[in-house]
């Protein structure tokens, strides 16, 4: 496990039975409350995509918008909201 993965595991909250019984919701709000960790997430995505040709980044709903736009800027490609 690398440092970023450890930091994410420590930050992401597990909320059992939300929004209904039997669902384990993973709340990433604590990640977004830590600017350096959020930046590390975007940089980690960017690093993982260095060898993949990318035409655009599509962000799906609210959380996808929050991380998709900075990633698109880092990669120098358009951002598409879905």
Predicted regions and their residues:
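PRPP-associated nucleotide enzymes
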Residues: 1-82
């Amino acid at each position: 496990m690398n440092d970023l993965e450890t930091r994410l595991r420590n930050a992401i909250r597990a909320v059992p039975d939300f929004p209904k019984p039997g669902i384990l919701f993973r709340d990433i709000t604590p990640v977004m409350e830590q600017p350096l960790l959020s930046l590390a997430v975007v940089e980690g995505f960017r690093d993982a995509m260095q060898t993949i040709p990318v035409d655009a980044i599509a962000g799906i709903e609210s959380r996808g918008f929050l991380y998709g736009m900075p990633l698109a800027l880092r990669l120098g490609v358009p951002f598409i909201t879905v």
